[in-house]
């Protein structure tokens, strides 16, 4: 839970913590952790949701390791998953804090909900079409 807590309140609302715990308890595969010198520095989920589409969820990066290529590494791994499973599209939910990051990888905004996660933390639904690279 430390990685989640380190990302609050900038990237995740503290009220989401129970949802994250429930997700971890229910997810048996598809959630990947990244370690450096035995420190958890990143985590993300990617799951097939249809014959053509996957969903990326709960992407977290340790604040001390942000802007060091971990996000790019995660996206490369996500695209590799899509390619190996012949999936064309990726859906993800994010906030205004990380929207620009996902735009760099071809994501487009498909929905915006002001204060959708919590006060001041807007929910942004995004899609990457033709994600196989």
Predicted feature locations:
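Conserved catalytic-core motifs of GNAT/GCN5-like acyltransferases
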Residues: 91-93, 108-127
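Conserved active-site tyrosine of GNAT-family acetyltransferases
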Residues: 102-103
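A short, well-structured alpha-helix characteristic of acyl/acetyltransferase catalytic modules
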Residues: 1-7, 132-133
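Conserved GNAT acetyl-CoA-binding A-motif
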Residues: 82-95
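Conserved acetyl-CoA binding element of GNAT-fold acetyltransferases
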Residues: 52-63
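Conserved acetyl-CoA-binding loop-helix of GNAT-fold acetyltransferases
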Residues: 61, 67-80
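Active-site rim helix/loop that mediates acceptor-substrate recognition in acyltransferases
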Residues: 9-36, 40-45
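Short strand-connecting beta-turns/loops that link adjacent beta-strands
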Residues: 37-39, 49-52, 131
